[in-house]
Amino acid sequence: MNIHEYQGKAVLRSYGVSVPNGKVAFTVEEAVEAAKELGTDVCVVKAQIHAGGRGKAGGVKVAKNLDEVRTYAESILGTTLVTHQTGPEGKEVKRLLIEEGCDIKKEYYVGLVLDRATSQVVLMASEEGGTEIEEVAEKTPEKIFKEYIDPAVGLQGFQARRIAFNINIPKELVGQAVKFMMGLYRAFIEKDCSIAEINPLVTTGEGKVMALDAKLNFDSNALYRHKDILELRDLDEEDSKEIEASKYDLNYIPLDGNIGCMVNGAGLAMATMDIIKHYHGDPANFLDVGGGATAEKVTEAFKIILSDKNVKGIFVNIFGGIMKCDVIAEGVIEATKQVGLELPLVVRLEGTNVELGKKILNESGLNIVAAESMADGAQKIVSLVG
């Protein structure tokens, strides 16, 4: 789960991480009032969406008086920002962060991520702050420094100091930088983050080390023990189809293709997408109905797939282990009738009660194309959608 920058900064502040003072605003008048309350000569007006690259897209403006705050708030609120992370459709700006300006001396990057290769949390840092870390990794990887953290003891002070020296934090500010990184690590662990990224971390003319931006992502599987974080969820920033899928315990991820996929099991779902690509098709989604799908779940899965206007055909690929093929067949028939399906539908069933499942489909009188194997099904649906 993602949260907004201003929410991330509030979380970090509770762990002793230094962040600029700021207030969230949902209207132009609230933005002006927030700037008045901050009482600083310079304010930064920042669009709040779940995506990076806001500055380049015109979503971050420096205001030197209240009139400029009003002008920038009017120009940003309600507009659609398109960045490299939003996709071409962009995201509508519905809230702003009004923040005090900083006398920036130098920008850095600091982040905590999970390294799956070593099964450890890794602290990464670079003195090339303010730019995409992926770009730094590609062009100048030698400028990225890493410290792998032993989960038994956590981030150690000497590791944070080594990072601070490696990225050339001024000596007089190393202590602050170490405190910053230790607080960031505590937040990462205690809040079950999957990413905690500060880009940029800055040193200021007043001799402070601060987080000028904050990106925190949380492990959705751990949200049951973080009710405070769950309350920060902004459904406006999430895909409506993903939200609907989560209500029925369906795992849905939208893609850019035109072949809808309904599969049970994440591994089979990925294999299904691979084989569709192999036969020169393009999957429109990843949709895992899980091991205990009911007729109701299958119907909802169909509705979610069909809500994507790019879908030109559907491939149902089910291996019946816990799930029985006859139950799936009945669900497919019920769903087809309910939604009035007119698109090509290819169904491949294998496993428990497979013959009964095929018999139910064959006797349904509906225009359902049966497939004998996954490869056969993929070829048929690719052919049908043209």
UniProtKB/Swiss-Prot annotation:
Q: Which GO terms describe its cellular component?
A: cytosol; succinate-CoA ligase complex
Pfam families linked? ATP-grasp_2, Ligase_CoA
Q: State the superkingdom.
A: Bacteria
* Disulfide bond annotation, renumbered to this chain: none
Binding of Mg(2+), residues: N199, D213
InterPro entries listed in its UniProt record = ATP-grasp, ATP-grasp_succ-CoA_synth-type, ATP_grasp_subdomain_1, SUCC_ACL_C, Succ_CoA_ligase-like_bsu, Succinyl-CoA_synth-like
Q: In which pathway does it act?
A: Carbohydrate metabolism; tricarboxylic acid cycle; succinate from succinyl-CoA (ligase route): step 1/1
* One BP term from GO: succinyl-CoA metabolic process
GO molecular function terms listed in the Swiss-Prot or TrEMBL record: ATP binding; magnesium ion binding; succinate-CoA ligase (ADP-forming) activity; succinate-CoA ligase (GDP-forming) activity
Entry note: cofactor: Binds 1 Mg(2+) ion per subunit.
Catalytic activity annotation: succinate + ATP + CoA = succinyl-CoA + ADP + phosphate; GTP + succinate + CoA = succinyl-CoA + GDP + phosphate
- Where are the annotated coiled coils located? none
Task: Tell me which residues make up the ATP-grasp domain.
Answer: 9-244
As cofactor, the record names: Mg(2+)
Q: Please state what class of enzyme this protein is.
A: ligase
SUPFAM superfamilies in the record, alphabetically?
Glutathione synthetase ATP-binding domain-like (SSF56059), Succinyl-CoA synthetase domains (SSF52210)
Q: Which residues bind substrate?
A: N264, G321, I322, M323
How is the subunit organization of this protein annotated in UniProt? Answer: Heterotetramer of two alpha and two beta subunits.
NCBIfam families, per database record: PRK00696.1, sucCoAbeta
Give the family from UniProt.
Answer: Belongs to the succinate/malate CoA ligase beta subunit family.
- Function comment: Succinyl-CoA synthetase functions in the citric acid cycle (TCA), coupling the hydrolysis of succinyl-CoA to the synthesis of either ATP or GTP and thus represents the only step of substrate-level phosphorylation in the TCA. The beta subunit provides nucleotide specificity of the enzyme and binds the substrate succinate, while the binding sites for coenzyme A and phosphate are found in the alpha subunit.
Write the protein's name: Succinate--CoA ligase [ADP-forming] subunit beta
Question: What gene is this protein translated from?
Answer: sucC
